[in-house]
Amino acid sequence: MPSIKRALISLSDKTGAVEFAQTLTKLGVEILSTGGTAKLLADAGVPVIEVADYTGFPEMLDGRVKTLHPKIHGGILGRRDLDEHVAKMEEHGIGNIDLVCVNLYPFAATIAKPNCTLEDAIENIDIGGPTMVRSAAKNWKHVAIVTDTADFPAIAAELEANNGALSDKTRFNLSRKAFSHTAQYDGMISNYLTSLSDDVLSGEPEIGEFPSQFNQSWIKVQDMRYGENPHQRAAFYRDIDPAAGSLSAYKQLQGKELSYNNIADADAAWEAVKSFDAPACVIVKHANPCGVAVAADTLTAYKLAYVTDTTSAFGGIIAFNREVDGETVKQITDNQFMEVLMAPKFTAEALEIAAAKKNVRVLEVPLEAGANRFELKRVGGGLLVQTPDIHRLNRADLKVVSKRQPTEQEWNDLMFVWNVAKYVKSNAIVFGKGGQTYGIGAGQMSRVDSTRIAARKAQDANLDLNGACAASDAFFPFRDGVDVIAEQGIKAIIHPAGSMRDQEVFDAADEHGIAMVVTDVRHFRH
């Protein structure tokens, strides 16, 4: 492991650069730098040589040409183990550059600005940076490349412990990270440019929602024991730029390793529970809510959600959108077996009680507003991409199509069951009252079958549906679903309408004295 003698540091994100450069200086490393990075280091008293002085060639073209010079790239790419390379470098006065610390122009931050022009974006496409990164990464056996300032402390510690040298393992891992960095950067540029309309020369082009070539980067969080079934292999990846409040930000406080199905179900539970403003509990089984409730506190919300379907809740995922206390956890552990318990925070007492069930996975997830930019679904040889279903119902946009108007309580219940229905697999029917689900019918090919299942769930739970409300994630194709709902004593229905037989459905509601509200928004979930 030869010691590092010369480093080139050129950073957009300069976090920790001074401290790292000071460590290099103590180890006798000569530092080359450019522009703002050179000034930062010099102002901090770090000896630094400007790249222009080192190459004898000035920075030019508004900074577009700074490091694109044989003395830089020859010093990075030259193989120390090949006599021919060594001789050529000596012939042309090219010295070795053993360490390159580069991160790239902030392209993502630039295009995220609301008034970003195409010219702004183009000027923030880094050329020299990726070239140095790839050169150093390619020659990893002889050169170390650092693209993430978060790595500075670990690299500095290893250099100090090894007389200024880095191990082959470290250099190779840094190389892999560097190539991933430039791949993600180029993918981001491609996404932006291929999202633009073709009228580039006639003015500012419009930015479309979907690029003509779709690039995304993911970071592996863990290999899993198996996938959806034991014979399938699986891993969990995190979006390189995850949305705020995403499940991927979870912190596991106790329990066994999360399985593939745990993560899938936990995501369904978390997306549902964080959609409620009031304290809420969502219990999920096989990615479907089997009980949902809102209440004044987490304990009450859990009790109400649990009674919807105590059988299906067994082995489920339980999610809250408020801090969970010890009393709530005790009630849960007394009632049922669960796979995952999740909330934005737990009290010390809650964690102490949960610890008695050492296999239960307890997750803390930041409760922040946010949604993935895109939802992805693989099909054979392709990918379906759509924006997420984050529509929030506004009562002012709803239309009453029945003779009877909903009461104020029915309005509240309709809003609640409609929000639950959005997270239930289609065909979805949800019955509820007083902020509590009374019956959930999910995933049936026939809407009337989902309706019958929801009714049976309420009957099994001894929940009286008289005066309850119903939500359907899509229109009723026939009046039979309304007739079954009416048989249960339900007094108000919310659904999107849009069927050829809408009027028959509306008439059925009037025949039964049901208040019917239409949304003009559908919530299919497959």
Curated annotation (Swiss-Prot):
SUPFAM superfamilies: Cytidine deaminase-like (SSF53927), Methylglyoxal synthase-like (SSF52335). This is Bifunctional purine biosynthesis protein PurH. Keywords: Hydrolase, Multifunctional enzyme, Purine biosynthesis, Transferase. GO terms for cellular component: cytosol. It comes from the Bacteria. Belongs to the PurH family. Residues 1-147 form the MGS-like domain. Pathway: Purine metabolism; IMP biosynthesis via de novo pathway; 5-formamido-1-(5-phospho-D-ribosyl)imidazole-4-carboxamide from 5-amino-1-(5-phospho-D-ribosyl)imidazole-4-carboxamide (10-formyl THF route): step 1/1; Purine metabolism; IMP biosynthesis via de novo pathway; IMP from 5-formamido-1-(5-phospho-D-ribosyl)imidazole-4-carboxamide: step 1/1. PROSITE patterns: MGS.
